[in-house]
């Protein structure tokens, strides 16, 4: 992360406080959930409505990401990274399992034909 961004995240927490930023995180997560819902409802709408929903989803994602980066300052970066690695490894194992199941299903379907 660029040093100037780290400075902004730290200053936000220092100026507004941990409790305020935790409240802001819940607000931003709620807005992201709404944006996801609106985006999913836009699938069968006009291109313009889809684009607006997409842009709003990107904006709300950025807001949550900025709050997460503030939480990295509030909490412990190393602990967050440790859990992140564990979760990614678990996700990778699930992906591999799903891929293997698809391969097996396809080979069984091919044999039955």
Language model features with spans:
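Flexible "arm" and connector segments at domain edges
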Residues: 1-113
């Amino acid at each position: 992360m660029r040093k100037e961004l780290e400075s902004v995240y730290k200053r936000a927490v220092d100026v507004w406080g941990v409790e305020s930023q935790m409240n802001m995180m819940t607000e931003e997560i709620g807005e992201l959930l709404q944006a996801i819902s609106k985006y999913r409802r836009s699938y069968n709408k006009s291109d313009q409505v889809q684009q607006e929903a997409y842009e709003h989803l990107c904006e709300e994602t950025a807001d949550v990401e900025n709050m997460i980066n503030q939480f990295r300052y509030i909490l412990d970066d190393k602990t967050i990274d440790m859990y992140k690695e564990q979760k990614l490894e678990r996700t990778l194992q699930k992906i591999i399992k799903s891929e293997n199941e698809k391969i097996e299903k396809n080979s069984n379907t091919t044999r039955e034909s």
